[in-house]
From Swiss-Prot:
GO terms for molecular function: transferase activity, transferring alkyl or aryl (other than methyl) groups. It is an enzyme of class 2 (transferase). Belongs to the tryptophan dimethylallyltransferase family. It comes from Aspergillus oryzae. It catalyses: cyclo-acetoacetyl-L-tryptophan + dimethylallyl diphosphate = beta-cyclopiazonate + diphosphate. Its EC number is 2.5.1.-. Disruption phenotype: Impairs the production of cyclopiazonic acid and of its biosynthetic intermediate beta-cyclopiazonic acid, but accumulates the intermediate cyclo-acetoacetyl-L-tryptophan. L-tryptophan binds at residues 84-85, 93, 195. This is Cyclo-acetoacetyl-L-tryptophan dimethylallyltransferase cpaD.
């Protein structure tokens, strides 16, 4: 059956071809495909990815990622598992680096036992997915994954103890997730993110201490001892508003991997963010100060409710568009090449007006002379969700990351990735099933 010309002009050819060629017999897999693949395909095509890379990444998405996303969320039905990845508990998210025209995705692998008494904190689903990816990603190395998982993820014995003692567990239970940088040429770099919250509750050890001790144990030759010591000192200075949150590392051999410590900052004002950017004055080189000027400019363009921000303690239902102010997230890269930890600032966009944010980003991108998808950002965002009014929506953009490298801003936008292009995708799905659109 032919697809209408209208739908055919909306979505890239690789999406259509694979929708016809891939096995879409599983109901949940099919729904995840038509919910996430159209936006995935559109962003790759718009960024000029090699067509072979587009097919490769979409095939990996269908064959490895989608089977690990669990049951598809249905309105009015309780979700199988709510992931800390998004405010809706959805386990998949796309992001785009507008400085490098680089697409990324992140997901929390879910399994059939996730959330049951046999795997109450979803610690078991991630390894089978990594084994599948190992066959597809040359250079994938699990040494640091194994190390940090053992140090920061709750063990089976600890999980049983938590349940047996009926200890109160927070709503955010995610232990780990995976992310991938997708190069336009077809190469992939995988990363893992590990959350020590439940381990901290089980052991009585603060999250920061768990992460710092795990890093010291991994850093056998003390290559990042200096920036780590400064980070420990800095976080202590910023207490109680700067809180340790989670840790990430690249899944490559340890000598080439980066370690990042993520924190939440509750004190939302420009002076607070300036202090984080300069590490309370420790970073004062010309590039840092140039980056500070750009950061101040971005601050003026994005909506922030200033003051002491409460920590989130709930998920929202998909299909809603709530208003809220989230804390900032900061990551600090620990590198042997720098004596100081290098901060990256994440502006919370979720809960703020999407049109205001999109226009602010467009102004900032234009002032930098960025082309490609940066040039068409507001129009592209609106096109992903044609049935959503940006003037009243607060949920299409989740985070905006900012750092400064090579004398220019380095920025990514993390986007709501659920039922984009819904009308066009539904038409393709109906044609695949043999129904008239």
């Amino acid at each position: 059956m032919e697809i209408s010309k209208k739908a055919a002009t909306l979505l890239p050819k690789p999406f259509y071809v694979l929708s016809q060629a891939l096995n879409l017999s599983n109901k949940d897999h099919t729904k995840w495909w038509y919910s996430t693949a159209p936006m995935f395909a559109t962003m790759m095509a718009g960024a000029g990815y090699d067509v072979h890379a587009q097919y490769k990444f979409l095939c990996i998405h269908r064959e490895v990622i989608i089977p690990a996303l669990g049951p598809y969320p249905e309105k009015g039905q309780p979700m199988h598992w709510k992931s800390h990845l998004t405010r809706f508990g959805l386990p998949f998210e796309l992001s785009f680096n507008y400085s490098k025209s680089l697409l990324r995705f992140a997901f929390e692998p879910l399994g059939s036992l996730t959330g049951t008494k046999d795997d109450p904190f979803n610690t078991q689903a991630i390894r089978p997915v990594l084994q599948d990816l190992k066959a597809m990603v040359p250079g994938l190395d699990l040494e640091w994954f194994d190390h940090f998982t053992k140090a920061l993820v709750v063990s089976e014995e600890e999980a049983r103890t938590l349940l047996d003692r009926d200890i109160e567990i927070p709503v955010f239970k995610t232990q780990n997730k995976l992310a991938a940088d997708l190069e336009p040429s077809g190469d992939i770099v995988l990363k893992t993110y590990i959350y020590p919250r439940i381990k901290s509750i089980a052991t009585g050890t603060p999250k920061e201490r768990l992460m710092f001790d795990a890093i010291k144990a991994a850093d056998k030759f003390g290559k990042v001892a200096t920036p780590l010591a400064i980070l420990e000192e800095f976080i202590a200075e910023r207490a109680p508003t700067l809180l340790g949150h989670f840790l990430s590392c690249d899944l490559v051999k340890p000598s080439e991997s980066r370690i990042k410590v993520y924190c939440m900052e509750r004190q939302l004002d420009l002076a607070s963010i300036e202090g984080i950017w300069t590490l309370n004055g420790r970073r004062n080189d010309p590039e840092t100060l140039d980056g500070l000027d750009a950061l101040r400019e971005l601050w003026q363009l994005l909506p922030v409710t200033e003051g002491l921000c409460p920590l989130p303690n709930c998920f929202y239902e998909p299909g809603t568009s709530p208003q809220e102010q989230l804390p900032f997230i900061i990551n600090f890269t620990l590198s042997p090449k720098s004596a100081l930890p290098e901060p990256q600032i994440y502006f919370p966009a979720f809960g703020q007006n999407d049109k205001t944010i999109a226009e602010g980003l467009a102004t900032f991108f234009e002032s930098r002379g960025w082309g490609g998808l940066a040039k068409s950002y507001p129009a592209d965002l609106a096109s992903y969700y044609p049935d959503v009014d940006l003037q009243t929506a607060n949920h299409l953009q989740a985070w905006i990351s900012f750092s400064y490298k090579g004398k220019k801003p380095y920025m990514s936008v993390y986007l709501h990735t659920f039922e984009a292009f819904s009308a066009a995708a539904q038409e393709v799905a109906m044609c695949h099933d043999g129904h008239n659109p």
